[in-house]
Swiss-Prot record:
Cofactor note: Binds 1 heme group per subunit.
Biological role stated in the UniProt entry: Phytoglobin that reduces nitrite to nitric oxide (NO) under anoxic conditions (e.g. during flooding or in waterlogged soil). May not function as an oxygen storage or transport protein. Has an unusually high affinity for O(2) through an hexacoordinate heme iron because of a very low dissociation constant.
Domain of life: Eukaryota
SS bonds (residue pairs): none
Site residues by UniProt (Homodimerization): 133
Signal peptide start and end residues: none
Locus of motif Homodimerization: 35-39, 105-117
Native organism taxonomy: Eukaryota, Viridiplantae, Streptophyta, Embryophyta, Tracheophyta
InterPro entries, per the entry: Globin, Globin-like_sf, Globin/Proto, Leghaemoglobin-like, Leghaemoglobin_Fe_BS
Catalysis performed (reactions): Fe(III)-heme b-[protein] + nitric oxide + H2O = Fe(II)-heme b-[protein] + nitrite + 2 H(+)
Protein name, as recorded: Anaerobic nitrite reductase HB2
Cited Pfam families: Globin
Length: 159
């Protein structure tokens, strides 16, 4: 079964709520990543030099927004096209950056957990449910698979 219109709607609806306080959501997202996997700190150039998560770091905010937006766009594409379609240049770049940063499969799960918890907190318990969690989870998983495939291509090209 493909990604449904309802799933797409759930992702879009919660994205609208998330967008209302991007600075807080971005900070929370990275706080959760480091809470789940403290060692991940060194994978982010904008966190390496800092003892704590920088409150007003534009790179941190920009990175979090990219993750949120790309996952939301993945949901829309999954319903419309049945797959995640990311521009080749963007995907190639994402693959290269993730390889250079030393990203492995388990890291994608850490980001997924942090993403889902950030969204849950942002929209509140009364709106968060299993359907919404599954919709965001599926959209993220498909995006992660596209990035992993490109990482493999990068490994194959440089091997």
């Amino acid at each position: 079964m493909g990604f449904t219109e309802k799933q797409e709607g759930l992702v879009k609806e919660s994205w609208e709520v998330l967008k209302q306080d991007i600075p807080h959501s971005s900070l929370r997202f990275f706080s959760l990543i480091l809470e789940i996997a403290p060692g991940a700190k060194n994978m982010f150039s904008f966190l390496r030099e800092s003892e704590e998560i920088p409150q007003n770091n534009p790179k941190l905010k920009a990175h979090a927004v990219k993750v949120f937006k790309m996952t939301c766009e993945s949901a829309i594409q999954l319903r419309e096209k049945g797959e995640v379609v990311v521009a080749d240049t963007t995907l190639k770049y994402l693959g290269t950056v993730h390889v250079k940063s030393g990203v492995k499969d388990p890291h994608f799960e850490v980001v997924k957990e942090a993403l889902l918890r950030t969204i849950e907190e942002a929209i509140g318990e009364e709106k968060w449910n299993e359907e919404m969690k599954n919709a965001w989870g599926e959209a993220y998983d498909q995006l992660a698979e596209a990035i992993k495939a490109e990482m493999k291509n990068h490994h194959d090209e440089t091997a």
